[in-house]
Curated annotation (Swiss-Prot):
Keyword Ribosomal protein: yes
MF GO annotations: rRNA binding; structural constituent of ribosome
Coiled coil: none
InterPro entries tied to this protein: Ribosomal_uS15, Ribosomal_uS15_bac-type, uS15_NS1_RNA-bd_sf
Gene3D superfamilies: 6.10.250.3130, S15/NS1, RNA-binding
One BP annotation, GO: translation
Annotated keywords: Ribonucleoprotein, Ribosomal protein, RNA-binding, rRNA-binding
Protein name: Small ribosomal subunit protein uS15
Gene name of this polypeptide: rpsO
Stated family: Belongs to the universal ribosomal protein uS15 family.
This protein's GO CC annotations: cytosolic small ribosomal subunit
Record's keyword annotation contains Protein transport: no
Pfam families linked to this entry: Ribosomal_S15 (PF00312)
Amino acid sequence: MAVTKDQTSQIVKKFKTSDLDTGSSEVQIALLTAKINDLTNHFAKHKKDHHGRRGLVTMVNKRRKLLDYLHRKDVKKYQDLIKALDIRK
C-alpha cells in the first residue's frame, strides 16, 4: 500500500525545518525513505513486479542524490537524518 496523506503529513511535521517547510532536503529524503520501505515490503510478496522495481530503483537513486547534496551542504544535518531514519548501518 502506498504512503497515505496522514503518514506524509506526520513525516513532514517531524522533519520540517520551518513552519511552512514541505520541500527541504530532509523532508524529501524522509518521504522517499517511507516510500522505499513500503515498496521493499511489496517486493517481498510480488517478486516478479519488474515495472515497480524500476520505480524503486529511481527512488533510491533520487534519495542518494539528495543525501549527497545534504552531506555537501551540512554534515551535521546529514548525520542526524541518517540516525533518525536508520538508513546507514
